[in-house]
A protein has these predicted regions:
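Glycine-rich anion/phosphate-binding loop at the beta-strand->alpha-helix junction
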Residues: 131, 135-136, 142-183
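Generic N-terminal targeting/processing segments that precede catalytic cores or assembly contacts
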Residues: 1-145
Length: 183
């Protein structure tokens, strides 16, 4: 049984992540990893982030206007505790899960790698969820940015960088952009 996965970050750093709460069903598997924020005072530190991957016969059965096609055969959406975009100005369309492009790309690459390894050519639905996400999100900028119902899945490097002046400046810039977009 797989208890650990290797993840190559966009910075080229290999991480070995312990899997928790592994559940298998006939055509579905889910597991969680615990978020580690290092020295960063991140309110999401220690929470469990779940991924559920489900085999589906026809991709058209899994698409909703709010899900995102990662590839021809892989579809992604957010579940419980993943915020939804409610205002224009972010990377995602209104209604979509607040999962930014770098994490989406990382998820797609990881799922495609497993599909190649096991010679699976069918369609897959990937759903991320964070049971504590709605409560934790209240302590973030998400409500001010128009992200409701949970946390956002962010990142550019795959590693949590300690809070910096640049991170704060980027957050303020994004909030100003949102205010401009929304009058």
């Amino acid at each position: 049984e797989i208890r650990q996965v290797k993840l190559l970050t966009p910075k080229g750093i290999e991480l070995y992540l312990e899997l928790e709460e592994i559940m298998r069903k006939k055509s579905e598997v889910s597991c969680a990893v615990r978020k580690y924020s290092g020295d960063d005072p991140d309110v999401t530190n220690g929470i469990l982030v779940y991924a559920t991957v489900q085999k589906v016969e026809k991709k058209s059965k899994i698409n909703s206007e709010n899900s995102v096609d990662l590839s021809e055969k892989i579809n992604l959406d957010g579940g419980i505790g993943i915020g939804r975009v409610t205002k224009p100005g972010l990377e995602q369309k209104i209604g979509q899960a607040a999962i930014n492009k770098v994490p989406r790309r990382m998820i797609c690459e990881a799922v495609e790698e497993v599909c190649r390894k096991y010679e699976y050519t069918g369609n897959l639905q990937v759903r991320l969820s964070v049971p504590e996400g709605a409560e934790v999100a209240k302590k973030t900028f998400n409500p001010r940015l128009g992200i409701e119902g949970g946390i956002s899945i962010l990142g550019t490097t795959g590693i949590v960088e300690p809070m910096s002046e640049k991170a704060l400046t980027d957050t303020i810039y994004l909030e100003m952009k949102m205010l401009k977009e929304n009058g």
